[in-house]
């Protein structure tokens, strides 16, 4: 059937006058392209103008040239450029224009950059002011920018005192404190030794059902052991309190507690921590056993030390030179010098070379036992085995020679120490000078006087 003429007239009219809408994709793509060229123009202009005297004019002209509006990324780039070139006085004009002239919602990242730039340059008041003015920029502040401000404030004790007031005001603004916020505060308190306040914060987090990062517990425990009195503080009870807040101590945490107890001369308690560690199915390593050995030997519980040494061997742990030194020292304290010498011999067979500490322990024990002959043998053995003598080695032997009235030998060792640039205590030099004078060896005594100046 043939179409009517009216249909053809309508069809021609539609083809001639209908409007085809622009693709939104093409419009967005075109806008992005213009903004890209504007950013390139801005970068180029800012690099050319090293002083950035008219930074806002540069920003606006770069985007006007490409017929588009400045973007948040452009503002952030300008602020970062000013911060890097230490032109912080120009940031305020950028912020003013951003607040008054722009309409977009300003990203929080811009304020984080400004706060960091001001804060780390010592402009604390300006950093605080920027944080509280964030709502004026069509932006809702959160823990993201609050954390940036806290990181600035906690650097110094003076500005740290401002934190409580700022936290109260931030909460009134609707800022929710997150785990990361508490972490910053606890780290700062631990650093300045306010471990009791840090502990209270952790307890508050636990009661408020905030998930606490295990590393935060470890940081707190480490700080407590650093700042508390190791001779009397109940660190085991403190550890139990932390357990109640869902903390499961690991190998490093137990090691910190053990070392703290040993420093306080509390060897028996160290053993109880080792036993608790095993109950918690945390496998002790060689460092743990070495620390516990040190503690029980300091308490003169030598049977326990022997048992622990056998235990670590049965567990397949290979003692290193530090473990051997602790155990050899225990044998020497029991006057079992033969056993100590055999242990050093075993070290060589098992591939753990004795170091200067090993020799110092044995030489001192031999001197104390009056066996200067074997002490001299070990002294020579050190040189043969390539073990460098330190100031403590020289001090032990010089003192031994003075004790048996062999002042000439003591003088010889002093000269050797000076030639090797090894430090010798002034009191020891004075003692040798006094003995030389008593022997009438005035020339040698006068030579040594130069080393006291």
From Swiss-Prot:
Disulfide bonds: none annotated. It comes from the Eukaryota. One of its GO terms (cellular component) is mitochondrion. Residues 1-77 form a transit peptide. Keywords: Mitochondrion, Repeat, Transit peptide. It is found in: Mitochondrion. Transmembrane segments: none annotated. InterPro entries: Pentatricopeptide_rpt, TPR-like_helical_dom_sf. PPR repeats lie at residues 107-141, 142-177, 178-212, 213-249, 250-284, 285-319, 320-354, 355-389, 390-424. Belongs to the PPR family. P subfamily. PANTHER family: PENTATRICOPEPTIDE REPEAT-CONTAINING PROTEIN GUN1, CHLOROPLASTIC, PPR_LONG DOMAIN-CONTAINING PROTEIN. This is Pentatricopeptide repeat-containing protein At2g38420, mitochondrial. It comes from Arabidopsis thaliana.
